[in-house]
């Protein structure tokens, strides 16, 4: 999917904290009916858009059905057309996924993925194989909604949150670093925000902060 908010990258040379160290907020940060829309800009050009919608899964309030779509603008379509869709079905009590569906169309490349999570037995079926895990696992979209519900008032600047996540049939520790609090101004107005950046492995595309 198109990169939405993440614009900063950091190295791994710092202490890491698993998200399980932080309790979930009693009041959930999202609910059925929520709709989010982001504009992705490259300078003065609207490069694309990302949309998220939360709904009950087959009218079953025990699960959230989150659908995320990422698509390039008409201008960018001429060069690199993107039409991505992500779906995650999340247990509303634990906020861990039970299913993940991904459909990607980017340029000339396209593929689909469907994962089934058995969090109780700590197993994941990716359509071909069953992968055993040592802990509960998020998918690449459910971890965002899980993170929104963490109580982070005691989070210190420089700390890193780690999210064990199943991506492309492998388990990765996705990490984000807390950069502090910041007042931001966007088209919708002024907001108090918590600032994070993703952590990337040294020796890959980005090597320095």
PLM region spans:
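Bacterial Sec-dependent N-terminal signal peptides
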Residues: 1-20
